[in-house]
Amino acid sequence: MWDSSYMQQVSEGLMTGKVPIDQVFGTNPLEKLYKRRKPKGTVGLQCSPCLMSKATSTDDIIWDQLVVRKTLADLLIPINRQISDIQSTLSEVTTRVHEIERQLHEITPVLKMGRTLEAISKGMSEMLAKYDHLVISTGRTTAPAAAFDAYLNEHGVPPPQPAIFKDLGVAQQACSKGTTVKNATTDAADKMSKVLELSEETFSKPNLSAKDLALLLFTHLPGNNTPFHILAQVLSKIAYKSGKSGAFLDAFHQILSEGENAQAALTRLSRTFDAFLGVVPPVIRVKNFQTVPRPCQKSLRAVPPNPTIDKGWVCVYSSEQGETRALKI
């Protein structure tokens, strides 16, 4: 039977919060009325060992995954930082490459101008070499020159005002009798007497002296006292003796304008220029072969039976002991 008064007290206690729920369930009055059904056996429900092992392995896998994720996150942080640095560096490199390309576009006309200036410089050097040996005046062809000589003959001294034709007066003073002239004045007079007469042939192909021609060739050769310097001296002397120094110089510049270097030009001219064909190389007497320029010592060979310049034999060195060696290019 239900106890209505007890249930009313319990309900009021539950509604008002005076009676805890656990206390109500712990003192259940209906426990004596109903027989509680107990499970078979004294042990409660338990999981099988297989299920327990599976649950345990699953927990381990989840934990391992968490550890791996954390490790990967820690590794990816510096990688991301390095990638960002690489991207910034690449952007800087790209900017610099674009700047270099822009500068190259600006330098291209300068390079073309450099080639033009090189060609102009080559032409000017040839023109100046010819101009040094041209005739400035071929005699008393102007009134100032005649007046200068007349004043000099009458008074014995040059006129007080600046004279245009001082070299002509120097020549007159050097040739006058009873006067003492310095060496520099004598040299100036000798140069005036050796000036070529101006003509079409001498203008285009001046007959340079062997020394001047060799010095002109030396400006195109690298180094000092090389076999090509000796070859330039030998060819200059032979060309001067044959009266073809101007033609030889023109042929030399022509080969240079084709893109060849000075060594190749001299070698080619020694084999093709008509003034050198079949010419025997000169003999140079030395104390011993140690006095031969050091760059030439490695090019000394035994003298062949019939050496000629067009076959590459530059000169023959003869020592005081009677030994001979030929310089070969």
Curated annotation (Swiss-Prot):
Record flagged with keyword Glycosyltransferase: no
Coiled-coil portions: 70-120
GO cellular component: host cell cytoplasm; virion component
Key words of the record: Coiled coil, Host cytoplasm, Transcription, Viral RNA replication, Virion
Location of the VP35 IID domain: 204-329
The keyword Transcription appears for this protein: yes
Function description: Plays an essential role in viral RNA synthesis and also a role in suppressing innate immune signaling.
Record family assignment: Belongs to the filoviridae polymerase cofactor VP35 family.
Assembly and interaction partners: Homooligomer. Homomultimerization via the coiled coil domain is a prerequisite for binding to L. Found in a trimeric complex in which VP35 bridges L and the nucleoprotein. Interacts with NP. Disrupts innate immune signaling in infected host cell.
Protein name as annotated: Polymerase cofactor VP35
Gene: VP35
